Amino acid sequence: MASLDVSSLLGMLSGDGVSALGKSADAKKSQVSSVLDSALPLLLTGMKNNASTKAGASSLNKALKDHAKDDTSDIGSFLQNVDLSDGGKILTHILGDSKEREAASIAERSGISSDQVMTILSAVAPLLLSKLGSSKAEDEEEDDDGAGLGDLLGSLLSGSE
């Protein structure tokens, strides 16, 4: 399994990534970090829940394939140029009706507005799909043992507990 967990995702976003997110959301780095600490496990859990049904897994697999080839070599640049509208749609697929409630909860804990949280999450969602998609593609190339999407998401979440 390719080495990817919540800690490594947070690490990738440190520095330029947090700065880019802070600029786009008009938030301090500490606030962005607080949002990410809460949001990444939430997004991964949402994806895992979606992947628990055949239709959800199929939809998520398609999204991962669509985003796997995104160029994320410069995360700061990726986040500055990300399509926030696409990110918002991704969030709706991942979180469904709870999107606004979750954003409000994260906003309260992070000391920023729900709109700022939504901007950050809308930027991070395509990056998350890209990283998961490329990790899944690597796993399929390395070892075609039938490990599913739920296994990948579960391994990511186990690193956050």
Model-found features: residue ranges?
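A structural "flexibility-hinge" signal
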Residues: 1-161
